[in-house]
């Protein structure tokens, strides 16, 4: 789906190149920060109301309970390295356009995606890596609609910008939305 939108960015005056930022350690550092935050904000809930929590929330909080100070320190050091690598990447490219998620929307009865293209996901949030890798970089991003699957399910792209260039990200998102009009479309599955 992303490739089919390339011409839109060309039409908007962008020079479009294939490029891969280095997301080394993004997965592990994000999971540490997420677990740490969950434990800080929901640790009392786990201790006092465990029987009322969903298994996914328990898993999230327990990831934070297991952490040590050195774990969080490591994650912070790696986050800064990731931030610097992304800054270097963004010095060469003004924007990064990437998928919002690694797969199209799934059935509402399914709690989370456990497998993508035959690859088993390590945990219940692994299918969202394309989003949380960007989050871990600390760079501004926005998700905008870019079309529909053959089944009529909505698909989006992320527009990622340079650090502190939220305005540039919003401008490109607006231009892309105006050029495509997908934001006005009601997914066929909803009609």
PLM regions with names:
Residues 1-32, 65-66, 71:
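Gly/Ser-rich, acidic/histidine-flanked active-site/gating loops
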Residues 23, 30, 59, 83, ...:
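Tryptophan-centric aromatic hotspots in well-structured domains and transmembrane helices
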Residues 30-35, 113-114, 157-159:
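Short low-complexity, flexible loop/linker segments enriched in glycine and/or proline
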Residues 94-96:
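Conserved acidic residues
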Residues 74, 106-127:
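Short, surface-exposed loop/helix-turn segments at secondary-structure junctions
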């Amino acid at each position: 789906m992303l490739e089919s939108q390339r011409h839109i960015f060309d039409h908007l005056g962008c020079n479009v190149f294939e490029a891969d930022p280095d997301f080394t350690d993004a997965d592990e550092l994000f999971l540490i920060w997420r677990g740490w935050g969950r434990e800080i904000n929901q640790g009392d809930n786990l201790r006092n109301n465990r029987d009322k929590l969903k298994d996914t929330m328990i898993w999230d909080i327990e990831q934070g309970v297991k952490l040590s100070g050195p774990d969080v320190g490591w994650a912070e050091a790696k986050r800064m390295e990731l931030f610097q690598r992304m800054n270097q990447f963004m010095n060469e490219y003004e924007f990064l356009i990437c998928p919002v998620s690694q797969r199209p929307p799934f059935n509402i009865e399914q709690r989370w995606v456990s497998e993508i293209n035959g690859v088993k996901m390590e945990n219940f949030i692994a299918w969202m890596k394309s989003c949380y890798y960007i989050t871990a970089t600390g760079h501004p991003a926005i998700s905008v609609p870019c079309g529909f699957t053959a089944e009529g399910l909505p698909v989006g792209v992320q527009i990622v910008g340079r650090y502190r260039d939220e305005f540039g990200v919003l401008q490109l998102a607006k231009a892309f939305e105006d050029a495509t009009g997908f934001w006005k479309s009601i997914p066929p599955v909803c009609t």
